[in-house]
């Protein structure tokens, strides 16, 4: 135990490179068992606390009075410079303003509204899988890249002819979750340019909706501007947030799903034989893969936790993936079991900031699994996965696989 504690002193949890190897799960298991509230001193970025147990992650995320969301909401260089979304974006607000922002777009994310997308999303998934089966050997990251863009684009009101552009720009703009893009000046410049182009695209789309409104999210953002509830810049930040939230986690979650089934082939056969397990399988995928690694909160007052003092103004990282591997809550937490019945995972968050797109995310995964079972008989890795070096996303640069038809 002393050697593990000594090793922890030399690990910077804000360094994305630490997460490029799945061995990080062992470090978080140690923290859950021996140091559930851990102080990460200033290094890559300012110092911060980490909570790793399920009970603590749930408590901190639910208590928006003690632990606020108005600062930077993820680890990254913006903690030095400040975050443009602070106090303005849905993820960076609390209380009445958060409720008001959420209400503006809630109608588009109800289960009833999402259900209308099912036939369309199923066709996108089936076409992507059929094309991959024709190639046989593919990078599965590319195979599933269109699914999240297609779904959020439909809700936003983006024409199908622009999907390719949206995929290209979102991949470039939000690829900065990768350590290589954070350290390369040219890559950072490309990401900034793509991000600017996305915001200009949003501005053009809002201009169109002012004269030709539709039943979509962009129209609702324009209506909120007209009512004085949002500035144009705030509306563009909202558009930005929905694209990011609907793209990275869903895409990498689908890739992580296939990887989990390749690691546990008996679970794949179990699901193919019994589709009644689809719902619990989706829950287990979300728990086991945990596409979103963490969120940040800021202490609004001095508070004590596990006998240690968190000072007002200090940041606290809520590590969702660690909570989802907590043996105090989950039996055999490191095992992938699609029949798991007790599964109160935190992959979609909890409390006031519970994922706005939860119904969409779960439907996407359920359709993806169903079509995967329909079309793919077996999958095998051609080479080990190349993981993203990211503190934010449990994702992949590449997963080269061979797919065989059902």
Map each language-model feature to its residues.
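Cytochrome P450
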Residues: 1-406
């Amino acid at each position: 135990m002393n050697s593990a504690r000594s090793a922890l002193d030399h690990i910077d949890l804000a360094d994305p490179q630490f997460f490029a190897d799945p061995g990080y799960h062992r470090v978080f298991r140690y923290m859950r068992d021996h140091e559930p509230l851990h102080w990460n001193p200033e290094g890559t970025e300012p110092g911060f606390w980490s909570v790793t147990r399920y009970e603590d992650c749930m408590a901190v995320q639910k208590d928006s009075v003690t632990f606020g969301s108005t600062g930077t909401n993820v680890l990254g260089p913006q903690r030095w410079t400040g975050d443009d979304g602070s106090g303005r974006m849905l993820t960076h607000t609390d209380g009445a303003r958060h409720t008001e922002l959420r209400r503006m777009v809630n109608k588009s994310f109800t289960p009833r509204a999402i259900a209308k997308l099912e036939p369309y999303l199923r066709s996108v998934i089936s076409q992507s899988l059929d094309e991959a089966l024709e190639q046989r050997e593919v990078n599965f990251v590319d195979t599933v890249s269109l699914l999240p863009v297609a779904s959020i684009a439909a809700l936003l009101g983006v024409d199908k002819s622009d999907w390719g552009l949206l995929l290209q720009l979102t991949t470039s703009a939000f690829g900065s979750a990768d350590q290589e893009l954070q350290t390369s000046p040219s890559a950072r410049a490309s990401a900034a340019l793509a991000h600017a182009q996305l915001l200009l695209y949003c501005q053009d789309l809002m201009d169109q909706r002012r004269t030709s409104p539709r039943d979509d999210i962009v129209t609702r953002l324009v209506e909120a501007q007209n009512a004085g509830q949002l500035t144009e810049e705030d509306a563009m930040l909202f558009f930005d947030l929905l694209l990011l939230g609907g793209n990275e986690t869903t895409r990498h979650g689908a890739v992580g799903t296939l990887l989990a089934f390749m690691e546990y082939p008996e679970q794949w056969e179990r699901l193919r034989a019994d589709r009644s397990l689809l719902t619990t399988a989706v829950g287990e995928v979300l728990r086991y893969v945990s596409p979103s690694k963490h969120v940040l909160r800021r202490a609004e007052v001095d508070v004590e936790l596990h006998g240690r003092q968190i000072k007002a103004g200090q940041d606290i990282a809520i590590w969702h993936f660690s909570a989802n591997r907590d043996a105090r809550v989950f039996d055999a937490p490191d095992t992938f079991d699609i029949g798991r019945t007790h599964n109160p995972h935190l992959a979609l968050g909890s409390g006031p900031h519970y994922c706005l797109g939860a119904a969409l995310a779960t439907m996407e995964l359920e359709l993806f699994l169903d079509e995967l079972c329909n079309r793919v008989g077996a999958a095998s890795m051609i080479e080990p996965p190349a993981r993203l070096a990211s503190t934010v996303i449990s994702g992949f640069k590449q997963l080269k696989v061979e797919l065989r038809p059902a």
